A protein has these predicted regions:
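Thiamine diphosphate
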Residues: 1-310
């Protein structure tokens, strides 16, 4: 298993080798955000050509400085902090979207999956806030492959992007080349069954639970389509033909995401279901929290059977 914050660092090691215009940094969380690549050197008074900035505990200052670098041109800044601390940088993030500055925000520790730091550090409403921001793309990858595509698309983007990354290790999703090619569309079918009775849609760390639930439901004779949605913003820009190909509209849907559910209702029907977070978290190991808040394959199976009246 690889945490997507670590997967992000692996990607940085590749991209920074060929793109010297990438200037990184973190708001005093470099070791946790994994924003320092093996090609970076520290920017200091003695090394003004360094490519990594230690911004200190000042998220707003970090993003305003990134905005300035983007406005100058010739530089592609990326900066990291915990997702929950995005609140401190919110105004500057909003301005970057308003000005179409292609900053890359590395927001790690993306859910209750961060564990014992507790509710002060566990983001709940933050993904909804970011997804509601015009001209801002939010990628929540499930594994190394999705993280690599998220980085590539963020680098190619003319708008700012957020990489929403896990603290905890995640399994790698097995997929064919054609599925990998669809990641950039924001949402795609990880598993399709011609006899499907249900869509299960997920992102990030919960995708593994959706895949396991689909296997368990198959044992009960219930066929399922599994959809990975690393970037809802990008998916909603796709034509309706593609959207309806990915999310079969004549089937009920369940979304599984350890965040506030409000982002999802624009693609769901009235009777569809979101397994999400509508309260603040708790301080406990990640596995215990996922069980407490219903993020288990068993709970998805139970909800699916109830939704299908089986």
């Amino acid at each position: 298993p690889i945490a997507t914050r670590k997967a992000s660092q692996i990607c940085l090691d590749h991209f920074c080798a060929d793109l010297p215009e990438l200037i990184g940094g973190s708001a005093d969380l470099t070791g946790s955000n994994n924003t320092f690549s093996k090609h970076n050197t520290e920017l200091t008074p003695d090394n003004p050509s360094g490519s990594h900035i230690y911004y200190g505990v000042r998220e707003f200052g970090m993003v305003t400085i990134m905005n300035g670098m983007s406005l100058h041109g010739g530089i592609r800044p990326y900066g990291g902090t915990f997702l929950v601390f995005m609140d401190y940088a919110r105004n500057a993030v909003r301005l970057s979207a308003m000005m179409s500055l292609p900053n890359i925000y590395v927001f790690t520790h993306d859910s209750i999956g961060l564990g014992e730091d507790g509710p002060t550090h566990q983001p709940i409403e933050h993904l909804v806030t970011l997804r509601a921001t015009p001209n801002l793309y939010n990628w929540r990858p499930a594994d190394l492959k999705e993280t690599a595509v998220a980085w590539k698309e963020s680098i190619l983007s003319k708008s700012p992007s957020c990489l929403i990354l896990s603290r905890q290790g995640l399994p790698q999703v097995k997929m064919s080349e054609d599925k990998i090619s669809n990641i950039s569309k924001g949402g795609y079918l990880v598993q399709k069954d011609e006899d499907a009775e249900l869509n299960i849609i997920s992102s990030g760390s919960e995708l593994q639970l959706a895949i396991q639930a689909a296997k368990d439901l198959d044992q009960s004779g219930i066929k399922v389509n599994v959809v990975s949605m690393p970037c809802l913003d990008r998916f909603l820009e796709a034509d309706l033909e593609y959207q309806n190909k990915v999310i079969q509209k004549d089937l009920p849907s369940i979304v599984v995401e350890a965040a506030h559910p409000n982002s999802w209702y624009k693609i769901l029907g009235r009777d569809d279901l979101v397994i999400g977070m509508t309260t603040f978290g708790e301080s406990a190991p990640a596995k215990m929290l996922f069980e407490e808040f219903g993020f288990t394959a068993g709970n998805i199976v139970s909800k699916a059977k109830k939704l299908l009246n089986k």
